[in-house]
């Protein structure tokens, strides 16, 4: 136990400097603005949202001046309709301050990573970006030998005040924590929305997305910290992760309380973590824990996680947020793919002298398919089709030029083809391409006040093939010796190493 407590001690020499004065620095808002430009969504550039036109250095200077004049600041608790400042751009002021707070609150975590002894190793790993697609070959290698999975939706805190209390162990600036609490109460309705089953990403308003994404990621980080720690103590080995941030675990106060209650059962908990075949992976609020153990062991895992979250982290954990499934008859919904491990029977003929034998064997195969129904729902929300999958025109784009319309549809189609190139069955992907192709034709026909048939007859259907077939042309150029490459392209799974973010339409599903 002394070794355990020594591991949990916080380095008191790394006290955090005051963060509140940074709120009055112009470069903070410039950094937040640049980050917003780089995170524009797939089919709506940031300039179309009007954000770029509203931002200027003069507005930032005026905002900072009003912040110095505290008489213009309205402190409130429950009235969400009350604005921050008196003036004409109240919503813009609120947006800019929240984005500045999001940049500032990330500084202690970034500084801790840079000042750590492992910073050189982290910097080296960051230079080579790891593709999202790289996890699927890993799953194919590991899941073939496992039997059960825990399909977990990470729980939410009972109250947003718990997030502030958790941040106190990282941030020592009391005024800044009060300001953070000020913003949380301004968006107090978010506290009731997060308890629902709908994905968290839908509740992040565009103007405050970074602020809430940071809070949610920090919340997930804390919930996983105890899991990572016990895993290390069980094997006395270092954990590896595709995100170096996960390995920097500091949760002294919570573990100290945890040891009081579980001192006698600590060895039992470590035994639970000594499953040599366990695999854990997560993206956003969805995590998968797979094991070769029995259903009884998986039930113990579920019981342990629920009690840990509710009793020691005060997270909202509902019974239907953790499901125990068997890999052989269940699809794993992860990173926009439906993955499964299916037994494939095959016959092998064996010849021994004059006798031959036919041996029936079963081989496990890892399949990844495109979730067609959620994707059609995403296309319907984006107004490319109705919820039955029937393509419709995009009236909002009808005022653009023909080349701009084709370029937008082409960019969406190429990104979808690029992201779902690892699908085992391409039939669903064909349907998505068909919806986008016909939606593009309907949009152009609407613009020229014509029917789709007459429009395609006049211009020909070849003009739509250019952006739909670009991926095949590029791959044919890379592998020119394969004469039948175009046929193999739609049968083989292709994983790319430049996928650094999940497809936006997948997030909408």
From Swiss-Prot:
One of its GO terms (biological process) is tRNA processing. Its main location: plastid. The keyword Oxidoreductase does not apply. Keywords: Chloroplast, mRNA processing, Plastid, RNA-binding, tRNA processing. GO terms for molecular function: RNA binding. One of its GO terms (cellular component) is chloroplast. It is found in: Plastid, Chloroplast. It holds the Pfam family MatK_N. InterPro entries: Domain_X, Maturase_MatK, Maturase_MatK_N. It comes from the Eukaryota. Belongs to the intron maturase 2 family. MatK subfamily. HAMAP family: MatK (MF_01390). Usually encoded in the trnK tRNA gene intron. Probably assists in splicing its own and other chloroplast group II introns. This is Maturase K. It comes from Clematis lasiantha (Pipestem clematis).
